[in-house]
């Protein structure tokens, strides 16, 4: 098998070119066997491009490049043609097509997609918030949250909190159990930002039985019994009635679908 050398040349970190190179090579060598991929990141000078092309010619390497500046792409392309080196421009054609479509010139700023902006930090902050105030751990977070989820056990409160956090919403959730009084903060918050998650007793019974079996426990425990589930749902309805919040039926709904319903409601109420 022929030894394959691939140079990934980028004016940023080179992640895009690296992933494209691996995706293409895997169509010929699924395990990337006998293949060497070398990344050349932050290449923003003519001198470095000339050195890379010289090295590629010596090692008979294939070049994949993602350079946003037109003059740098042209230089690399011309040098590769002179040295008869096979090279593929990953980003240039897309930039040119988009410029024509938008009737605008690109910024040609390397690494702009990786810049850490306000949105990035807001997302990280929201994710940390969701972890800190998950499962009613600290009721002080309820009044700070953008969204509060309440519901009985196994109604997808935690995965929904995490999904919404990735949309930059600070989410806290509280499990409602008949034996435990809900935190007083729950009755103090704006009901428009609180959502009760309800599920059919039959579906909840099935989910809880599966959960018990996955833990190696008997599926006839009180936790999964029909009467217990009805008691919890009745308690849930009593609490959400006091809060005056919207109730969403999550029976057979994907987390994404429920999240979209919540986001639409939040945006409508602004």
UniProtKB/Swiss-Prot annotation:
InterPro entries: Kinase-pyrophosphorylase, PPDK_reg. GO terms for molecular function: ADP binding; ATP binding; phosphotransferase activity, phosphate group as acceptor; protein serine/threonine kinase activity. Keywords: Kinase, Nucleotide-binding, Serine/threonine-protein kinase, Transferase. Its EC number is 2.7.11.32, 2.7.4.27. The keyword Kinase applies. ADP binds at residues 151-158. It is an enzyme of class 2 (transferase). It catalyses: N(tele)-phospho-L-histidyl/L-threonyl-[pyruvate, phosphate dikinase] + ADP = N(tele)-phospho-L-histidyl/O-phospho-L-threonyl-[pyruvate, phosphate dikinase] + AMP + H(+); N(tele)-phospho-L-histidyl/O-phospho-L-threonyl-[pyruvate, phosphate dikinase] + phosphate + H(+) = N(tele)-phospho-L-histidyl/L-threonyl-[pyruvate, phosphate dikinase] + diphosphate. NCBIfam families: PRK05339.1 (NF003742). Belongs to the pyruvate, phosphate/water dikinase regulatory protein family. PDRP subfamily. Bifunctional serine/threonine kinase and phosphorylase involved in the regulation of the pyruvate, phosphate dikinase (PPDK) by catalyzing its phosphorylation/dephosphorylation. This is Putative pyruvate, phosphate dikinase regulatory protein. It comes from Lysinibacillus sphaericus (strain C3-41).
